[in-house]
Amino acid sequence: MAYPFELGFQDATSPIMEELLHFHDHTLMIVFLISSLVLYIISLMLTTKLTHTSTMDAQEVETIWTILPAIILILIALPSLRILYMMDEINDPSLTVKTMGHQWYWSYEYTDYEDLNFDSYMIPTSDLNPGELRLLEVDNRVVLPMELPIRMLISSEDVLHSWAVPSLGLKTDAIPGRLNQATLTSTRPGLYYGQCSEICGSNHSFMPIVLELVPLKHFENWSSSML
């Protein structure tokens, strides 16, 4: 989860989020090197009056600043495309959960079970217990098994929403009349918080998401108690 004054990403809890963190570091290194080079050239231009008389006809320089940016873009694009394909790949999911966005709450349906569905509303600040998080706790958590591929089907009943859980690397738009899908696999148990990430009206800030990732045995016990 996030911490006050946190500057970086949340701790990765899924293979996809780990890949995104590596890609972020890879891209940031390239951007830092380019920025340093540009600042160095600007500082040289400001601190010296020397000029190159052949700048208007420098074929070698033009060749370099054409080929070098192309190579840099390829170094950024290839890992990005790899992660995009990984995010879209869903092979034989162990569980499918349908998520519907409403103004202003979420509803969930476990499609592999005959009658397992519920609504998830934010708990008002006045009803919170000691230690619970303001604007992030819900009355019904989404309980899922860890270390298994899970498919999320995401849509909306009314306006645009966005179902996002940062520590799992998930952010999928909930669009009325359209069914989007995402996949998640948690590498460890715990509570993972998210929020609606698309402005959807006056109570947009009050649509938290809470995933409770548990071992498979605990999930089976929970699902049996809910049926």
Swiss-Prot record:
EC number(s) recorded for this UniProt protein: 7.1.1.9
Residues where Cu cation A2 binds: C196, E198, C200, H204
Residues where Mg(2+) binds: E198
Cofactor: Cu cation
Predominant subcellular localization, coarse grouping: mitochondrion
Taxonomic superkingdom: Eukaryota
Gene3D superfamilies reported for this sequence: 1.10.287.90, Cupredoxins - blue copper proteins
Catalytic activity: 4 Fe(II)-[cytochrome c] + O2 + 8 H(+)(in) = 4 Fe(III)-[cytochrome c] + 2 H2O + 4 H(+)(out)
Mitochondrial intermembrane face of the membrane: 1-14, 88-227
Membrane-spanning ranges: 15-45, 60-87
Enzyme class: translocase
Cofactor: how and how many bound: Binds a dinuclear copper A center per subunit.
One family name in Pfam for this protein: COX2
UniProt GO MF annotations: copper ion binding; cytochrome-c oxidase activity
Keywords, alphabetical: Copper, Electron transport, Magnesium, Membrane, Metal-binding, Mitochondrion, Mitochondrion inner membrane, Respiratory chain, Translocase, Transmembrane, Transmembrane helix, Transport
Residues that bind Cu cation A1: H161, C196, C200, M207
One GO BP annotation of this record: ATP synthesis coupled electron transport
Cited function: Component of the cytochrome c oxidase, the last enzyme in the mitochondrial electron transport chain which drives oxidative phosphorylation. The respiratory chain contains 3 multisubunit complexes succinate dehydrogenase (complex II, CII), ubiquinol-cytochrome c oxidoreductase (cytochrome b-c1 complex, complex III, CIII) and cytochrome c oxidase (complex IV, CIV), that cooperate to transfer electrons derived from NADH and succinate to molecular oxygen, creating an electrochemical gradient over the inner membrane that drives transmembrane transport and the ATP synthase.
Assembly information from the UniProt record: Component of the cytochrome c oxidase (complex IV, CIV), a multisubunit enzyme composed of 14 subunits. The complex is composed of a catalytic core of 3 subunits MT-CO1, MT-CO2 and MT-CO3, encoded in the mitochondrial DNA, and 11 supernumerary subunits COX4I, COX5A, COX5B, COX6A, COX6B, COX6C, COX7A, COX7B, COX7C, COX8 and NDUFA4, which are encoded in the nuclear genome.
Protein name, entry field: Cytochrome c oxidase subunit 2
Species of the source: Tamias merriami
